[in-house]
Amino acid sequence: MVAVRAWSVVVPAKRLPLAKTRLRPLPEGLDGPPDAHDRLVLALLADTVAAALSSPAVTGVLVVTDDPAAAAEVTRLGARTVPDEPGRGLNPALEHGARATGGRAVAALSSDLPALRPEELTAALAAAEAAPRCFVPDAQGTGTTLLTAAGTDLSPAFGTGSAQRHAAGGAVALTGAWPGLERDVDTPGDLRGALALGVGPHTAALLGGAARPTG
């Protein structure tokens, strides 16, 4: 199935020192220089954004962030940025970003998907053509890595147990052969799982893991 709509993707990014606190300290074998945590968070974000920008279903990526380093990196990759003007947490930031895109088809994407492949996102967005609001559960089945809305409000409900909340709000759960899209990184175990799938070049360069194949 080929995506028909042109999707605007919104990615939220906290300030680097405040993000992914369960990854600090890095596990043995994945440790690095003193700023390794911030560099890892930035690498996860960069690989996620780069994969999204490479999907033919995506017309643009907008990152909502107040972090200067994150903003500079994703801008270099070709994404737009807006500041987190609401400053009230993840879901208001996503709503702000969705409005800022000006698009009718908007997808909220987690910022920690280093194993995401462009073709996985393309396939998921094609599947999302089936309903006004759809979501992709994470690998555990309890969280959400992708939420889509076409011609309707995004109404994000990210956070612990978000899959159940999105389903209760009328969004349709999508499943498919997209392990990289489902593999968000919150813990050292998640990170090892992503490395086993093959991560993008930014994360691979930082941690010495296997980069995912291109093409």
Swiss-Prot record:
Record SUPFAM superfamilies: Nucleotide-diphospho-sugar transferases
GO molecular function ontology, one term from the record: phospholactate guanylyltransferase activity
Pathway stated in the Swiss-Prot or TrEMBL entry: Cofactor biosynthesis; coenzyme F420 biosynthesis
Entry's Gene Ontology BP terms: F420-0 metabolic process
Chemical reaction(s) catalysed: phosphoenolpyruvate + GTP + H(+) = enolpyruvoyl-2-diphospho-5'-guanosine + diphosphate
Domain of life: Bacteria
Keyword Lipid biosynthesis belongs to the record: no
Enzyme class label: transferase
Keywords recorded for this protein, A-Z: GTP-binding, Nucleotide-binding, Nucleotidyltransferase, Transferase
EC number(s) per entry: 2.7.7.105
Residue numbers binding phosphoenolpyruvate: T144, G159, S162
Role summary: Guanylyltransferase that catalyzes the activation of phosphoenolpyruvate (PEP) as enolpyruvoyl-2-diphospho-5'-guanosine, via the condensation of PEP with GTP. It is involved in the biosynthesis of coenzyme F420, a hydride carrier cofactor.
Family as reported in the entry's similarity comment: Belongs to the CofC family.
Protein name, per record: Phosphoenolpyruvate guanylyltransferase
Taxonomic lineage of the native organism: Bacteria, Bacillati, Actinomycetota, Actinomycetes, Geodermatophilales
